[in-house]
Amino acid sequence: MNNVKELSIKEMQQVTGGDQMSDGVNYGKGSSLSKGGAKCGLGIVGGLATIPSGPLGWLAGAAGVINSCMK
């Protein structure tokens, strides 16, 4: 389990589709981000540890974890 890679901010933006905070997406409501943010973050961290190594494995796995978290 030593294959865990720390993703840079740029890599995470590529996986999630860009820097949404600076694109004017409305986070001002606070409800969706504050209620699910911590739970979602822990799910992503836990999910990333189980993704197979290799660039395609990381992209597919990280996208899947993030996508399932956003539902």
Swiss-Prot record:
Biological process according to GO: defense response to bacterium; killing of cells of another organism
Disulphide bridges: 40-69
Subcellular location: Secreted
InterPro entries named among the record's database cross-references: Bacteriocin_signal_seq
Taxonomic superkingdom: Bacteria
Keyword vocabulary terms for this entry: Antibiotic, Antimicrobial, Bacteriocin, Disulfide bond, Plasmid, Secreted
Record propeptide residues: 1-18
Any one cellular-component term (Gene Ontology): extracellular region
Described purpose of this protein according to its UniProt entry: Has antibacterial activity.
Stated name of the protein: Bacteriocin carnobacteriocin-A
